[in-house]
Amino acid sequence: MKKRTYLSAGLALLIGTLSVHASPGLSDVKSRVLPAVYKSKNGLTQKVEISVKHEGEPSTVTIRLGEQSRKEKLVSGDNVFRIEIPEVSTTRQLPLTLTSGKEKEETMVTVKPVRHWQMNMVQHTHTDIGYTRSQMEILAEHLRYIDYALDYCDATDNYPDFAKFRWTCEIAWAVSEYLKCRPAEQIARLKQRVKEGRIELATMYLNFDELPDEQTLAASLYPIKQFRENGMRAEVAMQDDVNGIGWCFSEYFADAGVKYVNMGTHGHRALICFDKPTVFWWESPSGKKVLTYRAEHYNQGNFFGIHTDDFEQFEERVLAYLDQMEAKNYPYDILACLLYTSDAADEEDS
């Protein structure tokens, strides 16, 4: 009997300590407790990933983990299976047995409680005047994106609530222009979706760097009044692709009724501060406060591959990210994941 210990690069992978009987058929058995709670017909569950190398001809294997048991097909080479177990509230040691013909592998798997993560996917169209094209050239496209968002809301009205399409208008410029030029029917559709919470209006006119002065930044918030005169709620500011935000906004936002700030950082030519998302009360010199979330990159969802239609890859990357958050002692169980298209994308793909 040979005892092996497998370590993961992420501290929260919870790899089990394995006692493996050497055999020509089954070998290199590993276990991994996934860092998430799943909803299923059996209630809340956790999943244990079992990987095993099979050196013989294709056959079947019986996997027993605790009280759960099932048969799977074995192929020559590497095999990966996921076993669903009831959610645990305390750390438990579960026996794992793999049986294929006369071959048998046994070990213990440590299953620890995991967080009830909530990851909010924030879909938006990133606005990058100058990097893409001039504002006169791209305005028509940004107005069209709002039309598309309204159509997608209509198309998913009969979906379960968690699956209904939702959209965030990253900056106020395009929405302000939309209210000036679109037909009354379209404006009414937008108002209704904002009222329902299906479309969120952000309040910053653009993603500003350090060049504008305080008077310019104060004047840039005029669309907030325009939105509210049209009966549309606007309580969040988004600052994407520019690391940091003008200090004067801490005063302006509070006075204008903006309650939240979300910052999607940029790490290509600038340093991303801190090693994980942060939440804090941004306090102005006069003592006014706005709740601020410093998120990851403003297209983090694209890094996860959500736009590729490869859900298995997307899930694996999200799980790896949750492992990282555990390892970095992220203190909350809610995360925001920003995702977008249009920034340098082909028009037909936007």
Cite the ranges covered by each PLM segment.
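Short stretches within intrinsically disordered, low-complexity N-terminal or propeptide regions
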Residues: 14, 346-347
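Generic N-terminal leader/processing signal
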Residues: 1-2, 346
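Sec/Tat signal peptide C-region and signal peptidase I cleavage site
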Residues: 19-21
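Catalytic-domain carbohydrate-binding cleft regions of carbohydrate-active enzymes
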Residues: 24-343, 350
